[in-house]
Design a protein with these regions (language model features):
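N-terminal intrinsically disordered, low-complexity, charge/repeat-rich segments that act as generic
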Residues: 1-45, 190-196
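Internal, charge-rich low-complexity segments
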Residues: 27, 31-34, 116-124
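Short boundary/loop segments of OB/S1/cold-shock single-stranded nucleic-acid-binding domains
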Residues: 41-63
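Structural detector for short beta-strands of small beta-barrel domains
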Residues: 55-73, 107
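OB-fold (S1/OB) nucleic-acid-binding surfaces
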Residues: 68-91
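Short nucleic-acid-contacting surface segments enriched for D/E, G, S/T with interspersed K/R
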Residues: 93-113
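Cytosol-/stroma-facing membrane-proximal "stalk/adaptor" domains immediately downstream
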Residues: 118-196
C-alpha cells in the first residue's frame, strides 16, 4: 500500500473500488482540476485525496454502520478494534439523494492509527484490543457501487451484528449527546465536533 501501514492488515477487507461520481457528489472539493490531473497521473507518483480514499476502501477493515437519524443524517460507523462507534453527520443533500430510513444497514471501511491518547469522542467497548487510539471510518455505500460485495458483507454482519451497533449508537447518544464528526472522508478521522 502506498498511503497506509503495510505492517498491519485488515481482517475484513472487502476490496471495493470507488465510484468517482458518488465520491464527487459526497465531497466535490477534492475534484478540483489540478486534483483530477494528478489522479490521472498517479502512476508517476502524484498524490491525491481520491487515491488515498480509493486505497482506504479497498484495503481497510469493513464493519457495519447504521442510520441513526435522518434530520440531520447521522450514521454510526462501527469498528471492532476499539469496539465502538464513530458518529458521523452528513449534509442534507446526502439524505435527499439516498432517502435513508432510521436503522438502514450500511457498511463502513476503517483504518487505524496510534496517537498519544484515545480520540475524545470514542467510547471504547469491553472488547477493545488496545492497539489503536485513532479510527478513520468511510461509509462504503456513499463512495462505491460494488453492491454485490457490500451486500455480502452486510449479510455476514447479520442481524446480531447490526443490533449490537444500534445499541452502541443508542448509548452514544446518551453519553455524547449532540457530538458527531464530519462524515466526509477527508475529515472523518478528525475529532471536529459537529453539534446536532
Amino acid at each position: 500500500m502506498k498511503y497506509h501501514d503495510n505492517t498491519s492488515f485488515a481482517s475484513d477487507s472487502i476490496g471495493i473500488d470507488i465510484d468517482l461520481k458518488k465520491l464527487k457528489f459526497l465531497i466535490p472539493e477534492i475534484f478540483s482540476p489540478i486534483q483530477e490531473i494528478k489522479y490521472k497521473f498517479k502512476k508517476w507518483g502524484f498524490s491525491t485525496h481520491i487515491e488515498v480514499i480509493s486505497e482506504h476502501v479497498k484495503y481497510g477493515d469493513s464493519q457495519g454502520a447504521i442510520v441513526v437519524k435522518t434530520n440531520p443524517l447521522l450514521i454510526a460507523a462501527y469498528n471492532e478494534d476499539i469496539d465502538c462507534i464513530v458518529m458521523l453527520v452528513f449534509e442534507d443533500k446526502i439524505q435527499n439523494k439516498y432517502n435513508f430510513k432510521i436503522q438502514d444497514r450500511l457498511v463502513c471501511v476503517n483504518t487505524f492509527a496510534e496517537i498519544s491518547q484515545l480520540q475524545s469522542d470514542l467510547i471504547p467497548g469491553k472488547n477493545n484490543s488496545g492497539m489503536w487510539t485513532l479510527v478513520h471510518p468511510i461509509i462504503a455505500d456513499l463512495v462505491s457501487s460494488d453492491a454485490t460485495k457490500i451486500e455480502k458483507r452486510k449479510n455476514e454482519i447479520g442481524d446480531k451484528g447490526y443490533e449490537y451497533i444500534w445499541q452502541l449508537a443508542t448509548d452514544y447518544l446518551k453519553l455524547k449527546k449532540g457530538v458527531s464528526r464530519i462524515g466526509k472522508p477527508i475529515f472523518s478521522d478528525q475529532v471536529i465536533p459537529q453539534y446536532f
